């Protein structure tokens, strides 16, 4: 199905203004996700004259990258807590005062119907519940836009290890959220571990709360880091500002005397009621622990991240094709395989905030009727070319290696929702020769808890040997939790409309 023909703004009208009297109705664009990519997409779409609705599930724009302090405890200088804060404030303020952009916060997208199911000219129908997730009066809305931009981001991937379910073991993303959003110290003695450049800002943020960071332990060895980051160094010239950020983190680490050690991993956490110590071991190139290198460190908190997993529920529900690496496949326009549906940010590859901003701008511009070859997109296209290369470098340098499964013991919990241990998964796989995730879920209940496999799904796939291209754990007809009463009452209570001017009921 081809997208509707975009309206042409009247001569002399503001770029983000409404069409002149008698002109065709403005093209409608729905953007899901108000992080860097979503904000950039919404702004670019408005500059093309589209009517925009911007949705986010939380109560503030900015996403995880620009996470705010609570209104009850504001900072006199919040800029100091964030990179690119002026970029965020410029984007947010422009959209917030623009009558052609409706920002809907607390908006949970729970389902997307593809065009055939929707039965209309719109590429998809997007069903949303607006209100606090624990509230009893959430309001239903259904959007049928001319174009949909998905910018849903990613979440931490944390590999299991003995003791990872103890209180005091945090994902690095949660640690960053506590530091940025609450200014809360997780403990007095903290270890940061896992893989990827995200460990550096997390350590800096945790140290800024007053905690003593005992070390940052990167699982990848120096050889892997060299392989990922040093080839074709001229490609990094355009990303010089990343060097400035790195220098800032190095300065923070030196100031706080934080060791950075490669080829080491936290392979176990110990404690009774909460974490009291961790075992750090040297690992080989495959991430298998090297016997005799174990070292026990007393801690009261540990923050772990082994990269990020893109949030694919909505792209899959919309019918978008994925790459073999399980990101959304897009072309030069950020268009997916579904006409009228675009994707930007971490769901197309883990490339960082600069790539997300560039992709978002391109997606919003094209969704509103523009072309990726338009002159005013030249800077964004150039930035995308520069920064999307980071995704491949990050994977080469810090990508998860298969030896991590040797950390596990039979009683190590893999699925935390259903408390399914590794031993049960291993025994079931060996007894039934079942490698399919569906049969494993039904037999062991792994992935059937409240998170529906968002946390453990890919881990279980790797343990049972499911094909890497499987999307079983990401395919959810209902993308977010809702009450049976909300589902039953959808038809009479849902407000069905096209996105329009701010203030629409």
What are these model-derived regions, one by one?
Residues 3, 27-90, 94, 199-240, ...:
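Beta1-alpha1 glycine-rich phosphate/pyrophosphate-binding loop at the start
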Residues 32, 143-153, 298-306:
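Short hydrophobic core segments
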Residues 152-191, 196-202, 324-332:
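Glycine-rich dinucleotide-binding loop and its adjacent helix/turn
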Residues 171-179, 301-351, 380:
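FAD-site-proximal beta/loop scaffold in flavoenzymes
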Residues 335, 368-406:
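Active-site-proximal substrate-binding core of FAD-dependent oxidoreductases
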Residues 344-380:
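A conserved FAD-binding loop/helix module that cradles the flavin
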């Amino acid at each position: 199905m081809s997208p509707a023909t975009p309206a042409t703004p009247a001569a002399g009208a503001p770029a983000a203004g409404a069409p002149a009297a008698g002109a065709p109705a403005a093209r409608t664009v729905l953007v899901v996700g108000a992080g860097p990519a979503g904000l950039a997409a919404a702004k670019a779409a408005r500059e093309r004259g589209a009517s925009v609705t911007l949705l986010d599930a939380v109560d503030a724009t900015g996403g995880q990258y620009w996470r705010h302090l609570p209104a009850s405890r504001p900072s006199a200088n919040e800029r100091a807590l964030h990179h690119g804060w002026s970029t965020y404030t410029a984007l947010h303020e422009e959209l917030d005062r623009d009558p052609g952009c409706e920002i809907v916060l607390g908006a949970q997208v729970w389902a997307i119907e593809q065009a055939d199911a929707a039965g209309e000219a719109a590429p998809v129908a997007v069903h949303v519940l607006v209100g606090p997730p624990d509230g009893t009066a959430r309001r239903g809305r259904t959007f049928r836009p001319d174009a949909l931009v998905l910018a849903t981001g990613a979440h931490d991937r944390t590999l299991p290890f003995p003791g990872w379910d103890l209180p005091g073991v945090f994902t690095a993303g949660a640690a960053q959220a506590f530091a940025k959003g609450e200014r809360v110290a997780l403990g007095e003695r903290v270890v940061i571990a896992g893989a990827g450049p995200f460990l550096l800002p997390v350590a800096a943020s945790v140290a800024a709360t007053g905690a003593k960071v005992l070390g940052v332990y990167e699982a990848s060895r120096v050889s892997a880091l060299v392989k990922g980051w040093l080839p074709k160094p001229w490609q990094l010239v355009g990303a010089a500002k990343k060097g400035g950020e790195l220098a800032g983190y190095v300065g923070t680490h030196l100031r706080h005397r934080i060791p950075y050690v490669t080829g080491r991993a936290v392979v176990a956490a110990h404690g009774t009621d909460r974490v009291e110590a961790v075992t750090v071991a040297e690992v080989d190139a495959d991430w298998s622990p090297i016997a005799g290198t174990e070292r026990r460190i007393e801690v009261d908190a540990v923050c772990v991240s082994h990269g990020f997993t893109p949030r694919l529920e909505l792209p899959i529900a919309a019918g978008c094709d994925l790459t073999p690496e399980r990101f959304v496949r897009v072309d030069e326009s950020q268009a997916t395989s579904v006409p009228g549906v675009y994707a930007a940010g971490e769901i197309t590859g883990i490339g960082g905030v600069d790539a997300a901003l560039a992709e978002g701008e391109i997606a919003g511009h094209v969704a509103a009727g523009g072309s990726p070859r338009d002159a005013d997109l030249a800077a964004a296209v150039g930035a995308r070319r520069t920064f999307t290369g980071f995704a491949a470098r990050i994977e080469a340098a810090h990508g998860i290696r298969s030896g991590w499964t040797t950390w596990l013991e039979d009683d190590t919990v893999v699925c935390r929702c259903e408390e399914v241990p590794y031993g049960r998964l291993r025994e079931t796989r060996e007894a039934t020769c079942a490698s399919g995730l569906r049969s494993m879920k039904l037999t062991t209940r792994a992935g059937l808890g409240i998170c529906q496999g968002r946390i453990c799904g890919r881990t279980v796939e790797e343990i049972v040997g499911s094909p890497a291209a499987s999307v079983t754990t990401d395919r959810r007809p209902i993308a977010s939790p809702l009450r049976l009463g909300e589902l039953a009452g959808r038809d009479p209570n849902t407000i069905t409309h096209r996105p329009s001017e701010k203030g629409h009921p």
